[in-house]
C-alpha cells in the first residue's frame, strides 16, 4: 500500500478512497481474528512535521526506484552481452521482452505508491525508456539476422 512504518505497528498513509476501503477491509480481517485495529485520521502539528513525513515517503520510494535502476542496468548488460555474442534469436528476444515487461510493471507499482513525487522517479522513467529503446534496437537486429538467413 506504500505506507511509512513508524514503530510498533503504527503506519502512515495519505487518505485516499482506495486506502480507506483497503484499511477497513484489513481492520475487518483483524477483528475477525480477535485482534485489535485502530484507524485514525491525523494532521501534522506544523509544516516541519509534515515535511518529515513526506521526506520518509519519498525516501522509501527512492529506495525502490534505486533497485529498479539497478535492474535496468542488468537488463542493458544482458542485451549488450547478447549483441556482442551475435545471439540474435527470437527465443532470446522473447526472454528479453518478458524481462522488460517485468521492469515496466515494477515501475508502475512503484509509481502508484509514489504519493509525493520521489526525486528518482524521473530518472527511473527515463532509464526505462532507454531500456525500451535498447530492446527495440536488439529486436531489429534479430529481424535483420533472420531476414539474411532466408
Residue ranges and their predicted role:
Residues 101-150:
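Glycine-rich, aromatic-bearing surface loops/beta-hairpins
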Residues 34, 41, 76-83, 87, ...:
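Long, hydrophobic, amphipathic alpha-helical segments used as structural scaffolds
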Residues 1-80, 105, 112, 131:
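Positively charged, polar, low-complexity stretches
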Residues 18, 43-46, 50, 57, ...:
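Solvent-exposed, non-transmembrane amphipathic alpha-helical segments
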Residues 71, 75-78, 82-86, 90-93, ...:
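Cap/lid and interdomain-hinge subdomains that line or gate substrate/regulatory clefts
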Residues 63, 67-70, 91, 98, ...:
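Alpha-helix boundary/N-cap detector
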Amino acid at each position: 500500500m506504500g505506507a511509512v512504518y513508524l514503530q510498533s505497528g503504527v503506519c502512515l498513509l495519505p487518505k485516499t478512497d482506495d486506502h480507506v476501503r483497503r484499511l477497513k477491509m484489513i481492520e475487518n480481517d483483524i477483528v475477525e481474528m480477535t485482534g485489535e485495529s485502530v484507524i485514525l485520521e491525523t494532521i501534522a502539528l506544523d509544516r516541519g512535521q509534515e515535511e518529515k513525513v513526506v521526506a520518509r515517503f519519498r525516501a522509501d520510494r527512492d529506495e525502490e526506484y534505486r533497485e529498479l535502476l539497478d535492474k535496468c542496468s542488468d537488463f542493458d548488460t544482458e542485451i549488450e552481452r547478447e549483441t556482442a555474442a551475435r545471439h540474435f534469436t527470437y527465443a532470446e528476444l522473447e526472454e528479453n521482452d518478458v524481462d522488460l515487461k517485468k521492469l515496466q510493471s515494477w515501475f508502475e507499482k512503484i509509481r502508484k505508491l509514489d504519493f509525493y513525487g520521489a526525486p528518482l522517479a524521473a530518472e527511473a522513467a527515463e532509464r526505462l525508456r532507454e531500456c525500451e529503446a535498447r530492446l527495440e534496437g536488439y529486436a531489429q537486429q534479430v529481424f535483420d539476422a533472420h531476414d539474411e538467413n532466408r
